[in-house]
UniProtKB/Swiss-Prot annotation:
Its main location: cytoplasm. Transmembrane segments: none annotated. HAMAP family: 2_Hacid_dh_C_GhrB. This is Glyoxylate/hydroxypyruvate reductase B. InterPro entries: D-isomer_2-hydroxyacid_DH, D-isomer_2_OHA_DH_cat_dom, D-isomer_DH_CS, D-isomer_DH_CS1, D-isomer_DH_NAD-bd, Glyo/OHPyrv_Rdtase_B, NAD(P)-bd_dom_sf. It is found in: Cytoplasm. It comes from Yersinia pestis.
């Protein structure tokens, strides 16, 4: 008899069929067991869980007594209680490699569109405001040869540094827990303290995950240390930046502008002051949102779950210590 799993996000048909070759697949649209008795029943039998979003905590895990593996179609996993999963011996799988290049593309797009005011000026053209040759009140600022400061030199940070260094001749600064030899050799990157990064970067690019240590890592004090001409780009996690402090800094000219793919509350509330600021480019968490990459993420998550439940995991496990007990 095939193991039973719960799939709580729509995936391409061929990937669904791949899962069905190995498991009895119970498909649902999201995780709301209180309103879906069928989902509650499926969770009781499920050995695997695959999807994205939802809060997977101790209370949720009590609904799934037979769960052995959870596979998230994302690189981030802050919606999972990793400690609770590990205590139960449940492997948590994620997709850290397949979205790297696409997220780096998104960050470059935010840098360019924010610096050159692409979104704002496109809307002004559509509104019929372009009636004569433009003046300097429509000008943006250059990206090339400016200093990029990367907060978090992981896979995405490396991909961003590559684009900045080779594509735009940008000096690369970075702050991370330890020096990154490859970044320094390939891109001439310079490891520095957070204070130095804030003081010298023309573009502060945040790629950090959300943890207790990174929560509000960039707040009023840190923003005040940045250049008044600096632009903040966040495609990591929203709560890494104190959003209220950022709004104030953008309103009073402490920093020049911001390009944001992530927010403290998502979707971004319609009454957010961020939506009223011309010096903000806000996009709806599209970092990995291309057809190709989302397919590859789903395929990776499918493989991850198959590997986890068949005992063949070699990578992409958040809590590999539990595999010893499987």
């Amino acid at each position: 008899m095939k193991p039973s799993i719960v799939l709580y996000k729509s995936i391409p048909t061929d990937l669904h069929q791949r899962l069905a070759q190995h498991f009895t697949v119970n498909s649902f649209d999201g995780l709301t067991p209180d309103n879906q008795p069928e989902l509650l029943a499926a969770l009781q039998q499920a050995e695997g869980l695959i999807g994205s979003g939802g809060k997977i905590d101790q209370d949720f895990l009590q609904l799934a007594p037979n769960l052995r593996a959870a596979s998230t179609i994302s690189v981030g996993y802050d919606n999972f209680d990793v400690e609770a999963l590990s205590q139960r011996g449940i492997a948590l799988m994620h997709t850290p490699t397949v979205l790297t290049e696409t997220v780096a593309d998104t960050m470059m797009a935010l840098m360019l569109s924010t610096a050159r005011r692409v979104v704002e000026l496109a809307e002004r053209v559509k509104a019929g405001e372009w009636q004569e040759s433009i003046g300097d009140d429509w000008f943006g600022v250059d990206v090339h040869h400016k200093t990029i400061g990367i907060l978090g030199m992981g896979r995405i940070g490396m991909a961003l540094a590559q684009r900045a260094h080779f594509g735009f001749s940008m000096p690369v600064l970075y702050t991370s827990r330890r020096p990154h030899e490859a970044a320094e050799q390939r891109f001439g990157a310079r490891h520095c303290s957070l204070d130095t990064l804030l003081a010298e970067a023309d573009f502060l690019c945040i790629t950090l995950p959300m943890t207790e240590q990174t929560y509000h890592m960039i707040g009023r004090e840190q923003l005040a240390k940045m250049k008044s001409s600096a632009i903040l780009i966040n495609a990591g996690r929203g709560p890494v930046v104190d959003e209220q402090a950022l709004i104030a800094a953008l309103q009073d000219g402490t920093i020049h502008a911001a390009g944001l793919d992530v927010f403290e509350q998502e979707p971004l509330p319609v009454d957010s002051p961020l939506l009223t600021l011309r010096n903000v480019v806000a996009v709806p968490h599209i970092g990995s949102a291309t057809h190709e990459t989302r397919y590859n993420m789903a395929a990776c998550a499918v493989d991850n779950l198959i590997n986890a439940l068949t005992g063949t995991v070699k990578e992409n496990c958040v809590n590999p210590q539990v595999l010893i007990t499987h």
